[in-house]
Amino acid sequence: MSNTTIGKFITFEGNEGSGKTTQSKLLYEKLLDNGIKAVWTREIGGTDIAELIRDIVLFKDMSITTELLLIMAARYEHIEKFIRPNLNEGKWVICDRFIDSTLCYQSENSEEQQLILELHRKLLDNFFPDLTLIINVSPSIAMQRIKIREIHKNTNQLNKFDSRNQQFHQKITDAFIQVSKLFPERIVQINGEPMIEDVSSEVINIINNKMKVNLLR
């Protein structure tokens, strides 16, 4: 089920280097510009405890099951301490990654995806976004953007997902396409390869249509 609070919960998903973080922040800023109360957050993270878990998951080697359980713990903390309270205050919560990333990164097949969804139902009260935007780019473009991003950061410290090969990024891209078919009423796919401004305009169009608002550009 979607959240039943008075605010709106919008998530952005996609491969590393897809531009989802940029687009999520642009939407957050656009909401504020239009007088809509909003907050921006991310997963793994969003609270002090969840951010500590983020560093462990992104930079330490572990089994996929350990990753999953740590992420679920971080998500529970995030929902209870940040997401739900802000939604209950009537704010829009814009989140960079949520359950769909877990379905893509922490599973190898449909059976494992069903296990994740069962955990989500039991542990997190089946809490889903009102709308999810998946930003799609080809794996080759994703890897180019990752390299450019790290140069601009002036650091060689890639997290373990950033540093994977093109085959891995293709697998994640394919997984997001498959997940979008599981939740067609909630998920909209967007081509993230055009200019940032063009992708942002498409995001605004989708938000206006799906959320019944009239955000000015």
Swiss-Prot record:
It catalyses: dTMP + ATP = dTDP + ADP. Its EC number is 2.7.4.9. Gene3D superfamilies: P-loop containing nucleotide triphosphate hydrolases (3.40.50.300). ATP binds at residues 14-21. GO terms for cellular component: cytosol. One of its GO terms (biological process) is dUDP biosynthetic process. It comes from the Bacteria. CDD domains: TMPK. GO terms for molecular function: ATP binding; dTMP kinase activity. HAMAP family: Thymidylate_kinase (MF_00165). Belongs to the thymidylate kinase family. NCBIfam families: DTMP_kinase (TIGR00041). This is Thymidylate kinase. It comes from Orientia tsutsugamushi (strain Ikeda) (Rickettsia tsutsugamushi). The lineage of its organism: Bacteria, Pseudomonadati, Pseudomonadota, Alphaproteobacteria, Rickettsiales.
